[in-house]
């Protein structure tokens, strides 16, 4: 029940506007690396020193105007340049709605190609985040178009979607770099598993499908059972460490992240920054309502 409440709040534009004005003081600092690219760079440098890789995400989604989309696109380019300038072990992640997908597919494609051009210049990999189901088809279509132009482009497949395995099979000709995730949006039972067990079993089957295809696989999970399954699978099939990695979110299980890195696995941390943090933060609380305690602490300190 609480999960649905927080997912509903994540889509509330009035609360998003208030949170943006208030800043990350409402407890979000645990999960968000500050407001600026400079703060994100500082965070990634610290992670890199601990043996962790990163992917930087400038927070924002559902751009309501071309001006907003343009601003996000420019910030993405700035982030890529910062990654190169500071020699960070980091990639870039972005959401298509943040660069104008809801305004027009042409606008989002124009911005994406410009971002990828800069990424290619600086040899920085980029991942297109998957959003809610209403944007699913467009995201896969845009990924297919741009993957042929930019080799170091990945996208995300959500394990709670029934169709996920078939979509992975359809992409095999692209040799896709995929981040496999559980899925964090509120979706209808008509398209997504409504329960954790069904999602977890499907998640495991997707990991096996993608890894055994020989394509690069990022297993994005904080679940020890999924981690153990992946470890056993790669050991049984002698899959090289260069073909996969684990990913976790900044601020969640940091000690476990370091443990995996020390065990010799590539461990990448998703590092978001920016003022448009509310929707992202609410989804993190929806995944684990106990995180709501950090919101209360943030308010009581003021």
Swiss-Prot record:
Belongs to the proline dehydrogenase family. Its cofactor is FAD. Converts proline to delta-1-pyrroline-5-carboxylate. Induction: Repressed by FadR in the absence of LCFAs (fatty acids of 14-20 carbon atoms). When LCFAs are present in the medium, they are converted to long-chain acyl-CoAs, which antagonize fadR as to its binding to fadR boxes on target DNA and thus derepress transcription. Keywords: FAD, Flavoprotein, Nucleotide-binding, Oxidoreductase, Proline metabolism. FAD binds at residues 130, 158, 182-184, 221-222. The active site is at residues 129, 179. Pathway: Amino-acid degradation; L-proline degradation into L-glutamate; L-glutamate from L-proline: step 1/2. It comes from the Bacteria. This is Proline dehydrogenase 1. GO terms for biological process: proline catabolic process; proline catabolic process to glutamate. Pfam families: Pro_dh (PF01619). The record marks 270 as: Critical for catalytic activity. It catalyses: L-proline + a quinone = (S)-1-pyrroline-5-carboxylate + a quinol + H(+). InterPro entries: FAD-linked_oxidoreductase-like (IPR029041), PRODH_bac_arc (IPR008219), Proline_DH_dom (IPR002872), Proline_oxidase (IPR015659). It is an enzyme of class 1 (oxidoreductase).
């Amino acid at each position: 029940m609480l999960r649905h409440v927080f997912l509903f709040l994540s889509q509330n534009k009035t609360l998003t506007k208030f949170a943006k004005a208030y800043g990350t003081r409402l407890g979000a600092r645990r999960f968000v690396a500050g407001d600026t690219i400079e703060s994100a760079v500082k965070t990634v440098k610290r992670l890199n020193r601990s043996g962790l890789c990163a992917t930087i995400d400038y927070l924002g989604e559902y751009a309501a105007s071309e001006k907003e989309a343009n601003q996000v696109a420019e910030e993405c380019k700035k982030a890529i340049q910062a990654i190169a300038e500071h020699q960070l072990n980091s990639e870039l992640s972005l959401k298509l709605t943040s660069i104008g997908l809801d305004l027009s597919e042409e606008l989002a494609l124009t911005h994406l190609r410009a971002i990828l051009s800069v990424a290619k210049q600086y040899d920085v990999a980029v991942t297109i985040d998957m959003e809610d189901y209403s944007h699913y088809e467009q995201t896969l279509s845009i990924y297919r178009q741009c993957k042929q132009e930019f080799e170091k482009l990945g996208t995300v497949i959500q394990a709670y979607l029934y169709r996920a395995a078939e979509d992975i099979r359809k992409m095999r000709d692209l040799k896709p770099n995929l981040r496999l995730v559980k899925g964090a949006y509120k979706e209808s039972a008509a398209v997504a598993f409504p329960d954790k067990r069904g999602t977890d079993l499907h998640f495991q089957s997707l990991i096996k499908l993608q890894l055994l295809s020989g394509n690069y696989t990022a297993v994005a999970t904080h679940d020890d059972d999924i981690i153990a399954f992946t470890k056993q699978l790669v050991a049984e099939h002698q899959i090289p460490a260069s073909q996969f990695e684990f990913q976790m979110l900044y601020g969640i299980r940091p000690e476990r992240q370091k443990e995996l890195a020390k065990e010799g696995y590539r461990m990448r941390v998703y590092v978001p920054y920016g003022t448009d943090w509310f929707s992202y933060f609410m989804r993190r609380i929806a995944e684990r309502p106990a995180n709501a305690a950090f919101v209360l602490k943030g308010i009581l300190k003021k």
